[in-house]
From Swiss-Prot:
Keywords: Disulfide bond, Glycoprotein, Membrane, Metal-binding, Receptor, Repeat, Signal, Transmembrane, Transmembrane helix, Zinc. It comes from Columba livia (Rock dove). Its main location: membrane. Residues 30-128, 129-228, 231-331, 333-434 form the Fibronectin type-III domain. This is Prolactin receptor. The keyword Kinase does not apply. The gene is PRLR.
Length: 830
């Protein structure tokens, strides 16, 4: 209910304001209280300035309250002090009470109130200006003066004798700006003397009570002083001076003569005497002066001296001057000032100044003791350099600038009482420049040498700036740890840095594209020949895939992770799926016609099988033939291979059985990889498209072939031990598992790394040699090792010659690294 009432009131007010805005009428503006003033500390008045009336007749009401009362009163009299004012008479005025006064303006629409003003009567007292100011000139005793008269300010309710006013008078010539103010006192008239004849003057008067402020100045009154005869103006004594503390002289300045010849008389009297004396000598010291010789000069006596000007009309007397001869001593300036420029043995010039004391000062007898002070400056300078010399009459000055002209002056004063004399006449001295020629030459030489040194240093910095900077600020050496990339330390992430340092807290990363091994050529024995094979058999679909796990946990077994190689395999499967419709018979005919070529081609992406669950090196499966044939050589790459082929040629391979201490290292067979063109590659891929994962194998000789070697074993190349751009690749053998049994091999050492290059064949085949280490060979295999050593020389040449006869189509078109293991040429016997 209240909200509805409030909203209705707001709507009504809105309509009212809208109506007022349309008619141009509004409530009155805010009034402002200008001032409150008491004329005589018994009554006071307040004035205000009204605001806008809002287009309607407006009434103004003054309300006040006293500090000791809560009652609010209205103004007692609105007409006594004029419009927009309120007059408080004696009955409504209390000098010791503070009033709180506000003014309210009201019309038909609304009202508005002024800001409150607090009034204390004693602080607002300011009388009116005096009235009835009159000016007239009069002559008395042949002297013309100005007489000014006025009346105190009028008071309404008080008699003229109830208050005492003090007055001030000011006057000036009409054409001037500055006023001359005279304090009059309580009297209401004043005589003004020393007015100039023929000048028009302006006069004003004001007053003040014992409390409060001065009143305003009265209205101006003007008067013209006539040009008639008048007495002389009052003269002014300028000074008195004793040059040697034995005699003294006084000088005065005369005023206007009043239009008549004027005589000036100096009168003096001594302390303790009533007799008045006249000046003994008006001529010795010049006009308007009086000279007191030794007879008329007394020490420790005070003289009262005045000057009187007299003409036919009247006379005037100066203000008195009290003189003690001891304190008016001011000697004449020194004389005989001489300047002499001298030079010492080292030819540095200096200035010698000499002078004489004033001739009237009795310095020899000790009656006067004088101190001296000199000043000098270059002729073109403005400021002087002042030097106190003391009682000596000569002075030496050093460090003068050559080629300049100096001005020198000297003055003096008594050591106890008195004042400084005037400065002596100016003396000039020109300092020659020939005294500094040697120094100038030295500075010129120094400047030239400095310039040459700067030029040489600048030229050196331009030519060899980098060397100098490197010499002055040698570079901070970086860490020289093998395998640490300095660029990786600066910009690499923490994971990359930890991986490079070999920490296993983060999975290791590397640039796999740069570290891939594209080809491996492996030959098992010296006696085996790489001959074409007529067996076009393919691995059975029922072939058992056995997962092999390497024991090398070096972290560098393969630069490729299984995820990267699996992506490669997926890409090849997409290509092979489009080629499954091709007739396999045509491929077999092509393989019969070019049997050795087709067996040299293997699928690029289906060589590798991975165990994605392993966190170690990838697991490489080996295929087992269905007709219980012994397993062939299986090639398992650890790098991202773009085009890899294995030549499955009927050769009689005798694997070298090795065994290490942990019985997990496989032997190192060698196979030959030859690159073929894309057509042959696609044909062979069709043959293997039905199998998701295959292992390229190298078949052994037929059973009826005679071979002095034992049956070959499955040889797995599973890890690259060291792969770097600036080093050779080292291949480690993989663990071999067959039918749940771990075959034990004999390893010629704890590990074998192919790090030495034996020879280069056909500019693209490297023959790698392993490191020579201590070989642990069982006694049962010593005859086999001896036979392999006997057959090594002859068989190596045959194998090398066969590798050279491989058609160019089987070779990789692009440059690749092909590895041959000469250690595999050594036969082994069971």
């Amino acid at each position: 209910m209240k909200q509805k009432l409030r909203s209705s009131v707001q709507i009504i007010l809105l309509f009212a304001l809208t109506a007022v805005g349309l008619t141009g009428q509004s409530y009155p503006g805010k009034p402002k209280i200008i001032r409150c003033r008491s004329l005589e500390k018994e009554t006071f008045s307040c004035w205000w300035k009204p605001g806008s009336d809002g287009g309607l007749p407006t009434n103004y009401t003054l309300f006040y309250s006293k500090d000791s009362e809560e009652k609010i009163y209205e103004c007692p009299d609105y007409g006594m002090s004029g419009p927009n004012s309120c007059y408080f008479d004696k009955n409504h005025t209390n000098p010791w009470t503070t009033y709180n006064i506000t003014v309210m303006a009201m019309n038909e629409i609304g009202s508005n109130s002024s800001d409150p003003q607090y009034v204390d009567v004693t602080s607002i007292v300011q009388p009116d200006a005096p009235v009835n100011l009159s000016l007239e000139t009069k002559t008395s005793a042949s002297t013309t003066y100005l007489l000014a008269k006025w009346s105190p300010p009028p008071l309404a309710d008080v008699t003229s004798n109830s208050h005492v006013y003090r007055y001030e008078l000011r006057l000036k010539p009409e054409e001037k700006e500055e006023w001359e103010t005279v304090s009059v006192g309580v009297q209401t008239q004043y005589k003004v003397n020393r007015l100039q004849a023929g000048v028009k003057y302006v006069v004003q008067v004001r007053c003040v009570l014992d409390i409060g402020e001065w009143s305003e100045w009265s209205s101006e009154r003007h008067i013209h002083i006539p040009n008639g005869e008048s007495p002389p103006e009052k003269p002014t004594i300028i000074k008195c001076r004793s040059p040697e503390k034995e005699t003294f002289t006084c000088w005065w300045k005369p005023g206007s003569d009043g239009g008549h010849p004027t005589n000036y008389t100096l009168l003096y009297s001594k302390e303790g005497e009533e007799r008045v004396y006249e000046c003994p000598d008006y001529k010795t010291a010049g006009p308007n002066s009086c000279y007191f010789d030794k007879k008329h000069t007394s020490f420790w006596t005070i003289y009262n001296i005045t000057v009187k000007a007299t003409n036919e009309i009247g006379s005037n007397v100066s203000d008195p001057l009290y003189v003690d001869v001891t304190y008016i001593v001011q000697t004449d300036p020194p004389v005989n000032v001489t300047l002499e420029l001298k030079k010492t043995v080292n030819r540095k010039p200096y200035l010698v100044l000499t002078w004489s004391p004033p001739p009237l000062a009795d310095v020899r007898s000790g009656w006067l003791t004088l101190d001296y002070e000199l000043r000098l400056k270059p002729e073109e300078a403005e400021e002087w350099e002042t030097i106190f010399v003391g009682q000596q009459t000569h002075y030496k000055m050093f460090s003068l600038n050559p080629g300049k002209k100096y001005i020198v002056q000297i003055h003096c004063k008594p050591d106890h009482h008195g004042s400084w004399s005037e400065w002596s006449l100016e003396k000039y001295l020109q300092i020659p420049t020939d005294f500094r020629i040697k120094d100038m030459v030295v500075w010129i030489i120094v400047g030239v040498l400095s310039s040459l040194i700067c030029l040489v240093m600048s030229w050196t910095m331009v030519l060899k700036g980098y060397r100098m900077i490197a010499f002055i600020l040698p570079p901070v050496p970086g860490p020289k740890i093998k395998g640490i990339d300095t660029h990786l330390l600066e910009t690499g992430k923490s994971e990359e840095l930890l991986s490079a340092l070999g920490c296993h807290g983060f999975p290791p990363t590397s640039d796999c594209e740069e570290l891939l091994i594209e080809y491996l050529e492996v030959e098992d024995s010296e006696d085996q020949q790489l001959m074409p094979s007529h067996d076009n058999g393919h691995p059975s679909k029922n072939a058992k895939m056995i997962a092999k796990e390497t024991d090398s946990d070096s972290g560098r077994g393969s630069c490729d992770s299984p995820s990267l190689l699996s992506e490669k395999c997926r890409e090849s499967r997409a290509i092979l799926s489009t080629l499954q419709t091709q007739d396999i018979r045509d491929v077999q005919e092509n393989n019969g016609r070019r049997h050795w070529e087709t067996q040299c081609i293997a699928s690029e992406q289906k060589i590798l099988l991975f165990n994605n669950e392993s966190t170690k090196s990838p697991i490489w499966p080996a295929a087992q033939l269905p007709d219980n044939q012994p397993p062939m050589f299986a090639y398992h790459s650890t790098v991202d291979v773009h085009k890899i082929t294995l030549c499955t040629i009927d050769v009689n391979i005798a694997p070298v059985l090795v065994e290490n201490e942990e019985q997990h290292q496989p032997q190192y067979p060698i196979t030959e990889t030859v690159h073929d063109n894309m057509e042959k590659h696609r044909e062979v891929e069709n043959l293997y498209s039905k199998t998701d994962q295959t292992t390229v194998q190298v078949k052994q000789n037929r059973p009826n072939d005679k071979s002095p070697f034992s049956k070959p074993k499955l040889m797995d190349y599973v890890e690259v031990h060291k792969v770097r751009q600036d080093e050779v690749a080292a291949v480690l053998l993989k663990h071999k598992e067959n039918s749940g049994k771990i075959e034990k091999y004999t390893v010629p050492g704890t590990s074998k790394e192919y790090t030495k290059v034996s020879t280069v064949v056909d500019h693209n085949i490297l023959v790698l040699m392993p490191d020579s280490r201590i070989q642990h060979i069982p006694v049962s295999q010593e005859p086999a090792m001896e036979m392999s050593q006997n057959l090594q020389q002859g068989q190596t040449e045959k194998n090398m010659s066969y590798c050279l006869t491989v058609p160019s189509e089987c070779k990789r078109e692009t440059s690749a690294s092909e590895y041959m293991d000469p250690s595999s040429f050594i036969p082994a016997f069971k």
